[in-house]
Amino acid sequence: MEGSGCYGRLSTDDAPEDAAVLSRAVGKPVRVQWMRDEEHAWEPKGPAQLEMVRAGVDAQGKVVAWDFMDRSFPWTAAAGMPLLASRQVGLKPKAQGNTNGTQGGGQFYSFENQKVVAALIPWVHPDETPLRTSNLRSPGDLARTFASESFMDEIATGLGVDPVQFRLRYLSHNKRMSEVLLAAANKSQWKDRPSPLPASSGSVATGRGIALADRGNTYVGAVAEVEVEKASGNVRVKRITIAHDCGLIV
């Protein structure tokens, strides 16, 4: 009764449920094992999220207010669990009444005034889509982290400040996050400067980016180096440097 291992509560136990139904039909134990391509073809998808971020900056360039709002659709469920078999016998999915959290909204930064909240978008007719929805791993931190870290870069760019040095201003209380930020920057040979660089004259533009994330007492910093072909818009990731502090491993 093994699934192919789509972690983070994504597989929704389809394989065990299939095995239970089949074994009752034939009166014998039945093993069901999905291959990874099958899992990814039928797995639940992450519900849509909308991230809205605002910040207040004083005359000295200090962030004095941070306002983060996550809005998302709920997960769907049929007969208690969003199983494929439920849909195939005609049961309609029901929308769960909970958000997918707020983590990833920039809480590890020490802003003087900070608000990070999540709101649920009512989903009156979840049966109108053929897609099941569930955690997109984390469960919603991916979108929130992308939004908060991208916005930190936008503020740094607006102030003409290096993105690493800008983040360090608000991490003096957070030793572990400061250390992964510096470790990733040093290992990638990060050079302090405001972003972006002036436009280049060649056919390829180069860029870099840095981002931070935390989850379950784990702290991560990552630097990405990319190239963009100006004519086609094709993006190539040249290198990613990651500093990972996972804390105590038991």
Question: What are these model-predicted stretches?
Answer:
Residues M1-E2, K28-D37, V64-M69, P163-S172, ...:
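Beta-strand segments within the central parallel beta-sheet cores of soluble alpha/beta enzyme folds
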Residues D70-P74, K115, H173, D214-G216, ...:
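Glycine-rich beta-alpha junction loops
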Residues S188-S195:
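Extended hydrophobic/aromatic segments used for targeting, binding, or gating
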Residues M1-K28, L83-Y109, N135-K175, E179, ...:
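Alpha-helical support elements that line or immediately flank enzyme active sites
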Residues A48-S150:
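Glycine-rich loop/linker segments at domain edges
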Residues A20, M52-R54, D153, P196-S200, ...:
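Generic recognition of flexible, low-complexity loop/linker segments
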Residues R24-A77, A205-I210, D214-V220:
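Phosphate/diphosphate-binding loops
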Residues A15-A19, E38, S72, S195, ...:
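Amphipathic, positively biased hydrophobic alpha-helical segments used for protein targeting
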